[in-house]
Amino acid sequence: MCLVCIGVVMSARMQESKKGILLKPKTCNTNADCAKFCKGPIQNCLYHTCACVPGNPHCC
């Protein structure tokens, strides 16, 4: 087993997760606002922060 290879893969994945932190959820005032950024299910999006970031399909 190649320990150096494993370290390279793990460091690449850590860099990917750090980039993901920059993708902040969108603040939406209405279901329509949320729908611009999110794909289903969209419910009760009044002055909420959409949980819609890549990898999380749910809105409010």
Swiss-Prot record:
One of its GO terms (biological process) is defense response to fungus. Its main location: secreted. The keyword Transmembrane does not apply. GO terms for cellular component: extracellular region. Keywords: Antimicrobial, Disulfide bond, Fungicide, Plant defense, Secreted, Signal. It is found in: Secreted. Disulfide bonds join 28-45, 34-50, 38-52. Residues 1-14 form the signal peptide. Belongs to the DEFL family. This is Putative defensin-like protein 279. The lineage of its organism: Eukaryota, Viridiplantae, Streptophyta, Embryophyta, Tracheophyta.
